[in-house]
C-alpha cells in the first residue's frame, strides 16, 4: 500500500464508504508500478467471514492518466451498476489500471498488466480494512471483460492467499488481432480507429522489440500524442480521427510480425481457467460481435473451462449489464454459497 484517503468525489459509489488508494502492483514486463483505485465498502456490519469482494475491471476509457474512472465528475454506467452490488452486501474494488490515475502510459490490451491491477487491489483492500474477506469474484466489461478472463487464469498462482470463486465477463473483446488487420488494410474511415490505435500503442509499450517509428507513418506518429492526452470518447468523436483512412497511419510493408504475435498473445481464446466462468453478451452489441463471443465460449469449452454463455436478445454493449443484473447476482451468490454445479452451456 502506498496511500489511502477518504474518497467523496462525484464518481464515488453513493451507497458505500469509499477510499481512494494507490497501491503496488506489477507491470506486464515485471516492473513495480503504482496504480490507483477505489475501495467501496457497504455500510453496516460485515458477515462473519468478512465482506465478500467483487473486483471490477472497467471498460475502455483511454490511455491517459485523466481517463481513470476515479477521476470522473459523475458516475458512469458501470459505477451506477456497481452501486447495486454494494446494496447486495459486497465490497466492490475498482482498479483504475496502470497509467490511468497515475503517471505513465496505460498498456491497453496488454492484459497481464490489467490482470495484476485487478487482483492486487484486493490485496490493497484487505490491507486497509481487515473486515474484507479473502473470497472474491472478478467481474469486468468490454476491455475489463477481457482482463477479467486473464485475471481468472493467473489468480491462483498470483494470489494464493486469496480464494477466487468465479469470473463474470461482459462483452469481452476477443478478436483484437482481426482489429489490427483491419486498421492496417482498410482505407475506409471508422469511428473505432482510436481504440485500435490505443491497442497498438498499449501492446507495443510492453515489448522493446517493437519500434513504432518503423511501423507507423508520419501521420500515425503525429497522432500518438493524442492517445496520451485525450480520452476515448473525445477521440472517437474527433474529425482528426474519424475522417482518417486507417491504413494511412501505417508504413507500407512495415515490420509487423512481432506486433501481430503480441496481439495474438493478448487474446483470451486459449486461456486455462479453473473457476466457474459466466460470459454475458448482447445480440445488439455495437462494439463486440455476438459471434466473436460465441467463438470465444467454444474455445474455452474446448480447453475444459467450466463456462456458461448467456446471450441477451436486444441488449447492447452497455445495457447487457443492467439486463442481466438479477441473474448474475444469483450466479455470484451461488459461488459464495459454495455451489459447485454450474449450468454448463459447453456442448
Predicted features along the sequence, with ranges:
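C-terminal catalytic histidine-bearing segment of alpha/beta-hydrolase fold enzymes
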Residues: 251, 255, 260-261, 287, ...
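Accessory cap/linker subdomain of secreted extracellular hydrolases
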Residues: 170-268
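Primarily recognizes the serine-hydrolase "nucleophile elbow" in alpha/beta-hydrolase
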Residues: 123-193
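Alpha/beta-hydrolase active-site loop
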Residues: 108-130
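Short, surface-exposed "cap/lid" segments of acyl-processing enzymes
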Residues: 28-36, 40-87
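Catalytic-loop region of hydrolases
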Residues: 1-46, 301
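Short beta-strand/loop motif that positions the catalytic acidic residue
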Residues: 273, 278-285
Amino acid at each position: 500500500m502506498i496511500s489511502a484517503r477518504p474518497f467523496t468525489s462525484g464518481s464515488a459509489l453513493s451507497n458505500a464508504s469509499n477510499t481512494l488508494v494507490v497501491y503496488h502492483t506489477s507491470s506486464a514486463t515485471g516492473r513495480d508500478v503504482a496504480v490507483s483505485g477505489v475501495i467501496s465498502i457497504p455500510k453496516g456490519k460485515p458477515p462473519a467471514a468478512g465482506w465478500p469482494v467483487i473486483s471490477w475491471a472497467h471498460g475502455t476509457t483511454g490511455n491517459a492518466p485523466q481517463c481513470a474512472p476515479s477521476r470522473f465528475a459523475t458516475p458512469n454506467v458501470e459505477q451506477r451498476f456497481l452501486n447495486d452490488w454494494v446494496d447486495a452486501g459486497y465490497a466492490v474494488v475498482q482498479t483504475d489500471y496502470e497509467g490511468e490515475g497515475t503517471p505513465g502510459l496505460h498498456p491497453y490490451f496488454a492484459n497481464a498488466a490489467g490482470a495484476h491491477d485487478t487482483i492486487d487491489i484486493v490485496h490493497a483492500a484487505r490491507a486497509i480494512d481487515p473486515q474484507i474477506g479473502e473470497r472474491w469474484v472478478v467481474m469486468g466489461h468490454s476491455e475489463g471483460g477481457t482482463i477479467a478472463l486473464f485475471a481468472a487464469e493467473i489468480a491462483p498462482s498470483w494470489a494464493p492467499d486469496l480464494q477466487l470463486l468465479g469470473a463474470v465477463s461482459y462483452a469481452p473483446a476477443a478478436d483484437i488481432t482481426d482489429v489490427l488487420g483491419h486498421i492496417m488494410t482498410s482505407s475506409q474511415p471508422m469511428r473505432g480507429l482510436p481504440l485500435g490505435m490505443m491497442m497498438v500503442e498499449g501492446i507495443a509499450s510492453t515489448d522493446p522489440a517493437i519500434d513504432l517509428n518503423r511501423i507507423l507513418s508520419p501521420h500515425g506518429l503525429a497522432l500518438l500524442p493524442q492517445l496520451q492526452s485525450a480520452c476515448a470518447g473525445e477521440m472517437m468523436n474527433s474529425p482528426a480521427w474519424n475522417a482518417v483512412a486507417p491504413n494511412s497511419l501505417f508504413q507500407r510493408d512495415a515490420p509487423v510480425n512481432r506486433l501481430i504475435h503480441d496481439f495474438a498473445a493478448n487474446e483470451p481464446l486459449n486461456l486455462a481457467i479453473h473457476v466457474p466462468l459466466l460470459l454475458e453478451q448482447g445480440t445488439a452489441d455495437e462494439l463486440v460481435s455476438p459471434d466473436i463471443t460465441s467463438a470465444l465460449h467454444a474455445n474455452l469449452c474446448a480447453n475444459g473451462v467450466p463456462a456458461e454463455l448467456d446471450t441477451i436478445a436486444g441488449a447492447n454493449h452497455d445495457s447487457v449489464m443492467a439486463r442481466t443484473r438479477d441473474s448474475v447476482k444469483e450466479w455470484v451468490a451461488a459461488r459464495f454459497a459454495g455451489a459447485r454445479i454450474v449450468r454448463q452451456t459447453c456442448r
